[in-house]
């Protein structure tokens, strides 16, 4: 774990820094270096949580601007993650539930089923009797978000990225304005950082965390380095090697170096904190409808040598000792177990939501360590590397003779949908940033809050998904085999409360900023909270809190918590477990 604070942070105890920040703002204004607009609430990041934050504040009568650095709204929810990771359904309320109700209404129209019929759609998460629908196509999700923002009369600004060098102007503990790379400036009374990266939070001088804490830091059991967790439990995880794979360029020869995708170093001390971040990938939308299918093609930078690890795993016949009956390998691209003619997750209109499968799937493990604190150019490079890895993996399964025929043959029936991501070559517009920066606030949500052993006051929403982390690295074990490390799948017994102080910075650091996406949580707890329905819940609550801070002329930390609770309940938020 790394605890960080932006070098230029302003503090109420440091008059010189406060005056410097104010002077910088004044100088910039005098120079006329870009258009300036003023709003009550400024939301940075058009993620699912950013949309609900903006809509909630606008519905409370505030003037709101939503700034999205890219061209699309909805983040992962409109970027391929159509098979919602739900957790406890009963904990989803407010604008989050309204979104899924609108999905249900969309598919209630027979005209929505262009490439299939409603009775063909099957999912263990879909109950036709419910008022919500949790599986949907990406373009449908984005249209719903656009409609919500238009109806609430939120000003939406796309294609504007925060200036990471001098883009946040503070006076004391208050953010006065934020400036984009173009020079465009936005003044506000309350700011909400709803980005996956937490750039506004970091550049406002707010303390934050990156990586994994040690177990000892917050009294947890599943944080930090976990090389023996699955082996000790003998759990045949979909993300762990179950067959023996040699890691060396020349098999058996450590002097020849490691093949692509294996990191140096052995198991390491168990439970020790580090800088590592769980792996990212793109959630792909694929289809097997011929008239709507764009065939897979060979990427220009395709390098078959990068997939030697995949080839060795697919062709290994030696089971590792703790997994003697692990069964067949799931298809790393299509995600099925080869007994089905289609991916596990089928969406409306014969589309898929294809996530990482197996220890050598879509995740570019260890390719994201620099992402959380990187500048825009470095992040763009990291995104390109993820695209390259994933598109190359697809072509490897289409074309490489090292791929057994039972894995190659199904690929001919699948491709990208013509009617999705039409302005990005049918490739998702959003990388799955599973975890980046995390606020270090007065309340840090931990494993013990999620499992119910520590109480949480001032609830602003509920979580209910398992504490889930993807792998952070591959290493060579004591027997010379490749292993993965970092997977966590720690279930929660029941829905748990998320406290208001987890989305507010410490008061001495910033008093008009809310952070509902990169909220204050340990690596383990964030693994549960980081689900898209919860981001929408927390965004909604942040929007209401922002409006109340303005109405009460109070710091976001000092608003009347009883009034916040009353407003959230009136708006349909679920703040407690339903009575049995």
Each language-model region and where it sits:
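N-terminal secretory signal peptides that target proteins for export/translocation
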Residues: 1-15
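Bacterial N-terminal signal peptides
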Residues: 18-29
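Bacterial Sec-dependent signal peptides at the C-terminal "C-region" and cleavage site
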Residues: 27-38
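Beta1/beta-strand and adjacent pyrophosphate-binding region of the FAD-binding site
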Residues: 37-47
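N-terminal Rossmann-fold NAD(P) dinucleotide-binding loop
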Residues: 50
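Conserved N-terminal/central alpha/beta ligand/cofactor-binding core
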Residues: 62-63, 68-169, 209, 217-219
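Flavin (FAD/FMN)-binding glycine-rich loop and adjacent Rossmann-like elements that form
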Residues: 142, 184-190, 194-579
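Conserved beta-strand-loop-beta-strand element in the redox core of flavoprotein oxidoreductases
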Residues: 167-185
């Amino acid at each position: 774990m790394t605890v960080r604070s932006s070098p230029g942070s302003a503090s109420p105890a440091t008059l010189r820094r406060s005056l410097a920040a104010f002077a910088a703002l004044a100088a910039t204004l005098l120079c006329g270096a870009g258009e300036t607009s003023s709003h009550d609430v400024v939301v940075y990041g058009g993620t699912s949580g950013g949309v609900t934050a903006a809509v909630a504040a606008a519905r409370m009568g505030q003037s709101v601007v939503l700034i999205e650095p890219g061209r699309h709204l909805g983040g992962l929810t409109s970027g391929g993650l159509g098979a919602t990771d739900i957790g406890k359904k009963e904990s989803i309320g407010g604008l989050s539930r309204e979104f899924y109700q609108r999905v249900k209404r969309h598919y209630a129209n027979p005209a929505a089923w262009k490439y299939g019929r409603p009775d063909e759609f099957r999912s263990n998460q879909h109950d036709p009797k419910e008022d919500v629908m949790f599986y949907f196509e990406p373009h449908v999700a984005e249209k719903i978000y656009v409609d919500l923002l238009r109806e609430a009369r939120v000003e939406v600004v796309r294609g504007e990225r925060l200036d990471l060098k001098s883009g946040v102007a503070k006076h004391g503990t208050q953010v006065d304005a934020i400036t984009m790379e173009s020079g465009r400036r936005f003044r506000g009374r309350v700011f909400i950082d709803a980005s996956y990266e937490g750039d506004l939070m970091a550049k406002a001088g707010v303390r934050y965390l990156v990586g994994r804490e040690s177990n000892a830091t917050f009294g947890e059991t599943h944080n930090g380095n976990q090389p023996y967790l699955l082996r000790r439990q003998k759990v045949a995880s979909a993300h762990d090697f179950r067959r023996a794979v040699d890691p060396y360029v020349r098999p058996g020869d450590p002097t020849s170096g490691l093949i692509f995708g294996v990191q140096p170093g052995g198991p390491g001390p168990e439970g020790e904190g580090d800088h590592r971040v769980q792996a990212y990938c793109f959630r792909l939308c694929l289809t097997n409808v011929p008239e709507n299918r764009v065939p897979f093609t060979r990427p220009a930078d395709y390098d078959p040598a990068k997939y030697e690890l995949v080839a060795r795993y697919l062709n290994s016949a030696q089971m590792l000792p703790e997994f003697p009956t692990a069964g067949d390998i799931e298809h790393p691209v299509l995600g099925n177990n080869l007994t089905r003619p289609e991916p596990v997750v089928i969406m409306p209109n014969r589309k898929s939501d294809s996530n990482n499968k197996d220890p050598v799937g879509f995740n570019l493990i260890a390719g994201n360590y620099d992402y959380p604190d990187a500048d825009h150019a470095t992040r763009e490079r990291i995104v390109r590397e993820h695209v390259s890895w994933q598109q190359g993996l697809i072509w490897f399964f289409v074309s490489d003779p090292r791929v057994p025929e039972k894995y190659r043959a199904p690929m001919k029936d699948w491709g990208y949908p013509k009617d999705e991501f039409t302005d990005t070559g049918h490739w998702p517009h959003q990388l799955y940033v599973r975890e980046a920066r995390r606020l270090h606030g007065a309340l840090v949500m931990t494993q013990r809050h999620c499992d119910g052993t520590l109480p949480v006051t001032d609830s602003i929403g509920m979580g209910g998904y398992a504490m889930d982390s993807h792998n952070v690295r591959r290493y060579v074990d004591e027997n010379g085999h490749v292993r993965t490390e970092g997977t966590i799948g720690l279930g929660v017994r029941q829905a748990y409360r998320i406290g208001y102080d987890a989305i507010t910075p410490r008061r001495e650091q910033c008093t008009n900023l809310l952070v509902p996406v990169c909220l204050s949580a340990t690596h383990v707890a964030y693994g549960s909270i980081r689900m898209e329905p919860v981001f929408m819940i927390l965004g909604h609550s942040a929007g209401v809190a922002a409006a109340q801070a303005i109405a009460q002329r109070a710091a976001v930390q000092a608003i009347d918590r009883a009034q916040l609770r009353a407003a959230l309940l009136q708006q349909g938020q679920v703040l407690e477990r339903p009575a049995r």
